[in-house]
């Protein structure tokens, strides 16, 4: 037998609490892709679901404060990518995920890859302002790396022609979209560095979707930009579009036209140096804010685990669980009572007076029909027997004898005369024949 003094004995509640803290503190944030099933959204506003693949599944909860930011309506069968933290639902001891963000799998995978590469390169210092090259105050030749048929090239050339038409330009045509685009752009940067004919490079294209701009989130391209000995201005998409190339480049311009303004002198009144410094400062501020945002997110995550709202979330989940259990119990009770009522109704129908009377009426009709059939058969038999008896009676009937030529003589009083001694002279006699009778007087 184990000695209690030598053992760390847990209660079930304490064990579950310890495991929950271990999962939440040690595992941190995880990214997970899977198919939604058992999705439910009770009145509390929280979401409960199961994420599964072909071999396993895990229960998940997404509380109201987080699911408000989801831009689509989840449904069973959806493939999604979620950002979540591991936890344990203590009352049942169920391991679960607390989802913080959710995206459809396609967009989510790209965004996840973007975030992972961004964190990796930031940790290596590729975004650090100290590693960035300054732009030349008065460029002697500008290199443009973009598609030779894209609108971005013509936007850049239009701005340069308007602001500084004497500025020489070298175009390095390349693909800016598709699977091979990142390698081609990196090769163009390498070619420009080896020729060393330009003192600033503009790398960019027009706006597009996340997939369209994805080549600018390539790690090889990012490292090529960081290694360039010629300052590079990233001018990808619109102002709201941010790529890895924007973070690595020496300066980020919100549009290709803005990049052209950075490298050209406005001969009328614009101070190119001031504009460049403004953009450089803006780039540094964006990098600083990005770093602060990451640190704030980490601090917020720690604070959330200790915040009363976190406890409220867990208690709210317990209330939702109790609510669902109560609803199921009420439904089972209602179903049981309904079945009992149906059974009693069925028994009542079996013993119903109306049904009983109908059965008796049917039985009476059968008896009546049977009685009538019996009477008909009996009457037919009796008629047949009567006919036979009548036939026999006819054979011994006096009328039959009369028909054979015989006659019957009776006195006036109706006495049959069988001997001459039965009459005397003067008696009136009636002789019956087969057809009629004869009246005579004895003489």
Swiss-Prot record:
GO BP terms, alphabetized: DNA catabolic process
Cellular-component GO terms for this entry: cytoplasm; exodeoxyribonuclease VII complex
Enzyme class: hydrolase
UniProt entry tagged with the keyword Cytoplasm: yes
Quaternary context: Heterooligomer composed of large and small subunits.
Family stated for the protein in its record: Belongs to the XseA family.
Descriptive protein name: Exodeoxyribonuclease 7 large subunit
Organism: Vibrio parahaemolyticus serotype O3:K6 (strain RIMD 2210633)
Gene expressing this chain: xseA
């Amino acid at each position: 037998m184990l000695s209690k003094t030598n053992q760390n004995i847990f209660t079930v509640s304490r064990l579950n609490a310890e495991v929950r803290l271990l999962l939440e503190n040690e595992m941190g944030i995880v990214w997970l892709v899977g198919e939604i099933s058992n999705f439910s959204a009770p009145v509390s506003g929280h979401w409960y679901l199961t994420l599964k693949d072909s071999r396993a599944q895990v229960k998940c909860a997404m509380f109201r404060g987080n699911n408000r930011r989801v831009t689509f309506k989840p449904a069973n069968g959806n493939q999604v990518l979620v950002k979540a933290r591991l936890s344990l639902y203590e009352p049942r001891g169920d391991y679960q995920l607390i989802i913080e963000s959710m995206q459809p799998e396609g967009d989510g995978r790209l965004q996840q890859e973007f975030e992972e590469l961004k964190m990796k390169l930031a940790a290596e210092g590729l975004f650090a302002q100290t590693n960035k090259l300054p732009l030349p105050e008065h460029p002697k030749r500008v290199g443009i790396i973009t598609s030779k048929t894209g609108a971005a090239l013509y936007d850049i050339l239009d701005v340069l022609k308007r602001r500084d038409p004497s500025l020489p330009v070298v175009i390095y045509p390349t693909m800016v979209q598709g699977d091979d685009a990142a390698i081609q752009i990196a090769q163009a940067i390498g070619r420009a560095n080896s020729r060393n004919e330009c003192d600033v490079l503009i790398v960019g294209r027009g706006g597009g979707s996340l997939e369209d701009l994805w080549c600018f989130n390539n790690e090889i391209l990012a490292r090529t930009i960081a290694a360039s000995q010629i300052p590079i201005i990233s001018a990808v998409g619109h102002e709201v579009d941010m790529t890895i190339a924007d973070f690595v480049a020496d300066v980020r311009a919100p549009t290709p036209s803005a990049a052209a303004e950075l490298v050209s002198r406005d001969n009328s009144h614009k101070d190119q140096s001031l504009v460049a410094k403004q953009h450089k400062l803006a780039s540094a501020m964006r990098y600083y804010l990005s770093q602060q945002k990451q640190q704030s997110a980490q601090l917020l995550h720690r604070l959330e685990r200790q915040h009363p709202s976190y406890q409220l979330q867990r208690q709210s989940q317990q209330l939702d669980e109790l609510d669902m259990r109560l609803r199921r119990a009420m439904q089972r009770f209602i179903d049981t009572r309904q079945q009992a009522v149906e059974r009693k109704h069925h028994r009542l129908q079996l013993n119903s007076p109306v049904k009983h009377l109908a059965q008796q009426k049917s039985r009476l009709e059968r008896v009546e029909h049977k009685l009538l059939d019996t009477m008909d058969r009996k009457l037919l038999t009796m008629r047949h027997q009567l006919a036979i008896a009548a036939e026999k009676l006819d054979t011994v009937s006096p009328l039959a004898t009369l028909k054979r030529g015989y006659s019957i003589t009776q006195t006036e009083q109706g006495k049959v005369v069988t001997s001459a001694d039965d009459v005397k002279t003067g008696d009136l006699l009636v002789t019956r024949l087969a057809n009629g009778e004869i009246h005579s007087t004895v003489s």
